[in-house]
A protein has these predicted regions:
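Compositionally biased, intrinsically disordered/low-complexity regions enriched for serine, proline
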Residues: 4, 39, 105, 156-157
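Short, low-complexity N-terminal intrinsically disordered segments enriched in polar/charged residues
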Residues: 5-68
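Short beta-strand edge/turn micro-motifs at domain boundaries
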Residues: 8-14, 18-21, 135-168
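Amphipathic repeat-derived elements
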Residues: 31-52, 117-118, 123-126, 148-150, ...
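Short solvent-exposed beta->alpha transition segments
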Residues: 57, 61, 72-137
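Hydrophobic, Leu/Ile/Phe/Ala-enriched alpha-helical segments that form helix-helix packing faces
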Residues: 66, 103, 107, 152-156
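Intrinsic disorder/low-complexity detector
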Residues: 71-72, 151
């Protein structure tokens, strides 16, 4: 056999190779579509989809604790520190007493009353974070806008004047 002699063409091997490549490409495409659906169908680059997914999860956990009136646990989610009670002085900018005034069902500052249900209506990028519009107690308008910071996994109120448009 010389250097210029080509090996015999193996049709079965070529067919297996093509089936493998097309199957792999199809599987990766299906995986990408499922990831996009689970992340909430964000209109953003794929490398940001996990931020939407984690932001929705954190907001759902936070509001579930508020619905159960477990404000201590909800505050831990808000500041992303489960053991916040061991060092409360570290969170002097937004202390637990002020958090209770904002989120308690009997608080005069809580314009939604006792929070019983919630639904994330929309999520979008804002700066480095994810802005989430949440409809409280079955409302169709006047959503609660929360910002999720993917760097430190904490929640915050949306900046003044910044809210997601839910339509007419």
């Amino acid at each position: 056999m010389t250097l210029l002699d080509a090996p015999k063409f193996d049709a079965a091997r070529e067919q297996r190779r093509q089936v493998f490549l097309y199957s792999t490409a199809g599987f990766l495409f299906v995986l990408l579509v499922v990831w996009w659906l689970v992340a909430g169908r964000p209109v953003d680059w794929p490398w940001n989809w996990n931020n939407y997914l984690f932001g929705r999860s954190v907001v759902n956990n936070f509001l579930s604790d508020v619905e159960k009136n477990d404000l201590a646990s909800a505050y831990g989610i808000w500041i992303h520190d489960k053991n916040w009670q061991q060092h409360p002085a570290q969170y002097g900018a937004y202390p637990f007493a002020r958090f209770q005034e904002d989120w308690s069902s009997t608080s005069p500052d809580n314009e939604y009353g006792a929070i019983q249900t919630h639904k994330i209506a929309l999520a979008g990028r804002y700066g480095n974070g994810v802005l989430l519009a949440v409809l409280i107690n079955g409302r169709k308008s006047k959503a609660l806008n929360l910002e999720y910071d993917p760097k430190n996994h904490s929640l915050n109120f949306a900046p003044p004047g910044v809210e997601l448009y839910l339509g007419p």
